[in-house]
């Protein structure tokens, strides 16, 4: 007897029992949770109703995360799970689920920002640049190209909270996809009011 997602085994609202008028059906089984962890990619396919497929991610180590204010999406490494509004147990076991808050590697976003604006981001004062980074930031450009970069620099503003995270090399992000259903951990980088809210929550949790 498998587990099934049905409601005819429950009593009525009045308290009376229901007579089962059919057996358990193949279209109403309950399956074990994926409990996606951080690790080398491992995905199982599950055949579901209609011959369709679901992708159960058992382990994931990267995902596509978008930086909304800069309209930039990059594949980046998942480092750690830091907060989950629904269950602290899922933070302790580092389980990836939709809407959990995690730390992702900031390097792809920093590289994009520096190439796009020709400005350093999240660098410690007086830090040495590698020859490749030096070339990107201090490249000799034609007048027309230089003018384009000067125009871009006018809008290259980043909030102090994000700047601080770039210095640490880790960004707070939220998962928007469902890893146990589609086999991917994609999401967005936290910014603005949402970032402030979750920083407060994480700080309060650490203080306990």
UniProtKB/Swiss-Prot annotation:
Localization of this protein: Cytoplasm; Membrane; Nucleus, Nucleolus
User: Which Pfam families does this one have?
Assistant: Ribosomal_S8e (PF01201)
Naming one, the record's GO cellular component terms include:
nucleolus
Q: How does it sit in the membrane?
A: Lipid-anchor
Basic residues bias located where? 8-26
Q: Name one GO biological process term.
A: maturation of SSU-rRNA from tricistronic rRNA transcript (SSU-rRNA, 5.8S rRNA, LSU-rRNA)
Q: From the UniProt entry, list the residue stretches annotated as the region Disordered.
A: 1-37
Q: Is Nucleus a UniProt keyword of this protein?
A: yes
According to its UniProt record, which protein family does this protein belong to?
A: Belongs to the eukaryotic ribosomal protein eS8 family.
Q: How does it assemble?
A: Component of the small ribosomal subunit. Identified in a IGF2BP1-dependent mRNP granule complex containing untranslated mRNAs. Part of the small subunit (SSU) processome, composed of more than 70 proteins and the RNA chaperone small nucleolar RNA (snoRNA) U3.
Q: What does this protein do?
A: Component of the small ribosomal subunit. The ribosome is a large ribonucleoprotein complex responsible for the synthesis of proteins in the cell. Part of the small subunit (SSU) processome, first precursor of the small eukaryotic ribosomal subunit. During the assembly of the SSU processome in the nucleolus, many ribosome biogenesis factors, an RNA chaperone and ribosomal proteins associate with the nascent pre-rRNA and work in concert to generate RNA folding, modifications, rearrangements and cleavage as well as targeted degradation of pre-ribosomal RNA by the RNA exosome.
The molecule here is called: Small ribosomal subunit protein eS8
Gene name linked to the record = rps8
């Amino acid at each position: 007897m498998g587990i099934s997602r049905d409601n005819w085994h429950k009593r009525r609202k009045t308290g009376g029992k229901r007579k089962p008028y059919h057996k358990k059906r193949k279209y109403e089984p309950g399956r074990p949770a994926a409990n996606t962890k951080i690790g080398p990619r491992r995905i199982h396919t599950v055949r579901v109703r209609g011959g369709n497929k679901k992708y159960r991610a058992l382990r994931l180590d990267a995902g596509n995360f978008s930086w909304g204010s800069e309209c930039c999406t990059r594949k980046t490494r998942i480092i750690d799970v830091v907060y989950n509004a629904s269950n602290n147990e899922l933070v302790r076991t580092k389980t990836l689920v939709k809407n959990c808050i995690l730390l992702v590697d900031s390097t792809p976003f920093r590289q994009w920002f520096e190439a796009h604006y020709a400005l350093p981001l999240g660098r410690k004062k007086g830090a040495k640049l590698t020859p490749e980074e030096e070339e990107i930031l201090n490249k000799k450009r034609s007048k027309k190209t230089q003018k384009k970069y000067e125009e871009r620099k006018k809008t290259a503003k980043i909030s102090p909270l994000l700047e601080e995270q770039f210095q640490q090399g880790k960004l707070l992000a939220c998962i928007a996809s469902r890893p146990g259903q589609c086999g991917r951990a994609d999401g967005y980088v936290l910014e603005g009011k949402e970032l402030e809210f979750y920083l407060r929550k994480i700080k309060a949790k650490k203080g306990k």
